[in-house]
């Protein structure tokens, strides 16, 4: 039993609370948890951030501080924020402090581990490189992902980051068979709800046949959830949504990462874990809010002076060891579509592959709106992907680059003023651009088109046929939202 040390609140400024500890041998340590109860009797967890004076600590709250008052008792728990572990966490939904929020009962008796942990030691890190195929043409061809790597999805508001991350969950988590952890950081509660329902429908989270049947009929009766079946689920959720205070949004990434680390390290042979973060910018944004509230001098564009170190501390824990791997896919919001903003720019340096979503491509109706010229991968070389794949990817990039250079001339003088050779380049580049689009399973309700997963060999074959001029006689419209090149050919034979 932990001997709780009692203090009292002496100041409340929004989510920042100062607590006085009198007549104690030592103050709670940095990152230690304190608890206080609001007028409704709900527990609120505070995390120590600063020692100010001899007897006072400054804390950030993990929940809304409405109803708290000066003079109220606060108790030190003697531990940091921690997450439950064990097979009981499979399929469950947690908040930042490890409490369940899915209505399926608490896990009070489970063993817990701290969310503040050191990265694995250098000698335990793995150096193996394997390609993680996603079934999405533009990703697999021009910016292949690395199993056990860190991947960033960059884009402004409304260009498709969340839809792409949901499709990646659908494609990889289903076909891959490993365990997944999803951290919802400062995003819409509705999206978290939609994702949970999608996971239940697809069988990644197992609520049992009885619940599933009711769900199909529009009901949500959690009393019908099969707890034994739930333990066989392949995904776990941790949410700190946009309506929550900055303390929760700043720590929820670490809470989710702690579960991913547990899955990776908890078995003798280890496991390969998928760790999805939506959205890593909100982690930075919450840190900026807290920094201002704690009185630190802001740096460039108002961000916290500790931006690089906070990001580095978190990203260094997302790594692969000889025991297992964590493949991290992170959505990154780009403020005002400015890639030079300090928040996305700081994230760039930690990533193995970047997928940049473009508003310009989105406006053309090409989805996913990935910009193949701005997107990168450190394994796009013959050494890792082979000669055929590399040459095809380079040819695709070259023709799109040339098309981009010609667009100014086309806008001013018109396409008729181009040389015959450049006209051919433009026509083929437009076909390539449209063939990079693809119908998604998670977007089927919007497009009315069944989602497609495309093998890398079929992808290379299709683009080579376009680049070699074998399909010049097929109109551009037939290349849009198709999977394989055979679908394009079949579509061209039908009357529009």
UniProtKB/Swiss-Prot annotation:
Instruction: One GO cellular component term, please give it.
Output: proton-transporting ATP synthase complex
Q: Where is the major localization of this protein? A: membrane
As given in the record, the signal peptide range reads: none
Gene Ontology molecular function terms on file: ATP binding; ATP hydrolysis activity; proton-transporting ATP synthase activity, rotational mechanism
SUPFAM superfamilies referenced in this protein's UniProt entry, alphabetically: C-terminal domain of alpha and beta subunits of F1 ATP synthase, N-terminal domain of alpha and beta subunits of F1 ATP synthase, P-loop containing nucleoside triphosphate hydrolases
Indicate how the chain sits in the lipid bilayer: Peripheral membrane protein
Keyword check for Hydrolase, yes or no.
Answer: no
State which Enzyme Commission number(s) the record gives.
7.1.2.2
Binding residue positions for ATP: 155-162
| Compartment list | Cell membrane
CDD domains under this entry?
Answer: ATP-synt_F1_beta_C, ATP-synt_F1_beta_N, F1-ATPase_beta_CD
**Reactions this protein catalyses:** ATP + H2O + 4 H(+)(in) = ADP + phosphate + 5 H(+)(out)
List, alphabetically, the Gene3D superfamilies matched.
2.40.10.170, Bovine Mitochondrial F1-atpase, Atp Synthase Beta Chain, Chain D, domain 3, P-loop containing nucleotide triphosphate hydrolases
Q: State the family named in the UniProt similarity comment for this chain.
A: Belongs to the ATPase alpha/beta chains family.
Q: What is this protein called?
A: ATP synthase subunit beta
């Amino acid at each position: 039993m932990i001997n709780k040390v009692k203090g009292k609140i002496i100041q409340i400024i929004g989510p920042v609370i100062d607590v006085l500890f009198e007549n104690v041998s030592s103050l709670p340590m940095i990152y230690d948890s304190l608890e206080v109860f609001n007028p409704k009797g709900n527990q609120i967890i505070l995390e120590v951030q600063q020692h100010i004076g001899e007897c006072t600590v400054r804390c950030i709250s993990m929940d809304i501080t409405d109803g708290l008052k000066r003079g109220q008792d606060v108790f030190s728990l003697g531990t940091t924020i921690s997450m439950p572990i064990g097979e009981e966490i499979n399929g469950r939904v947690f908040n930042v402090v490890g409490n369940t929020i899915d209505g399926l009962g608490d896990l009070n008796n489970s063993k817990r581990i701290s969310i503040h942990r050191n990265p694995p030691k250098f000698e335990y890190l793995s150096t193996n490189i394997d390609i993680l195929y996603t079934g999405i043409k533009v990703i697999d061809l021009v910016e292949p992902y690395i199993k056990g790597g860190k991947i960033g999805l960059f884009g402004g508001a409304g260009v498709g980051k969340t839809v792409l991350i949901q499709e990646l969950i659908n494609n990889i988590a289903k076909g891959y068979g490993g365990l997944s952890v999803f951290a919802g950081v400062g995003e819409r509660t509705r999206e978290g709800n939609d994702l949970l329902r999608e996971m239940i429908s697809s069988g990644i989270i197992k609520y049992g046949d009885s619940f599933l049947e009711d769900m199909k009929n529009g009901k949500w009766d959690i009393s019908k959830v099969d707890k034994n079946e739930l333990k066989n689920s392949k995904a776990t959720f941790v949410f700190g949504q946009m309506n929550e205070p900055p303390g929760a949004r700043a720590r929820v990434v670490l809470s989710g990462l702690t579960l991913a680390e547990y899955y990776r390290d908890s078995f003798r042979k280890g496991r390969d874990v998928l760790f999805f973060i939506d959205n890593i910018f909100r982690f930075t944004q919450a840190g900026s809010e807290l920094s201002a509230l704690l009185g630190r001098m802001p740096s460039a564009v108002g961000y916290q002076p500790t931006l690089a170190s906070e990001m580095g501390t978190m990203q260094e824990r997302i790594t692969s060891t000889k025991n297992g791997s964590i493949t991290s896919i992170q959505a990154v919001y780009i403020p005002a579509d400015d890639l030079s903003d300090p928040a996305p720019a700081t994230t760039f340096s930690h990533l193995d592959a970047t997928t940049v979503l473009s508003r310009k491509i989105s406006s053309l109706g090409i989805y996913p709106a990935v910009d193949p010229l701005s997107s990168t991968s450190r394994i796009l070389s013959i050494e890792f992907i082979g000669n055929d794949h590399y040459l095809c990817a380079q040819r695709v990039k070259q023709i799109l680059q040339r098309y981009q250079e010609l667009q100014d001339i086309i806008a001013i003088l018109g396409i008729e003023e181009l040389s015959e050779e450049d006209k051919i380049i433009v026509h083929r580049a437009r076909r390539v651009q449209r063939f990079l689009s693809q119908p998604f399973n998670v977007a089927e309700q919007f497009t009315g088109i069944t989602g497609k997963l495309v093998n890398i060999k079929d992808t290379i074959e299709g683009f080579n046929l376009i680049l070699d001029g074998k399909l010049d006689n097929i109109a551009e419209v037939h290349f849009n939202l198709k999977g394989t090149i055979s679908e394009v050919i079949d579509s061209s034979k039908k009357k529009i």
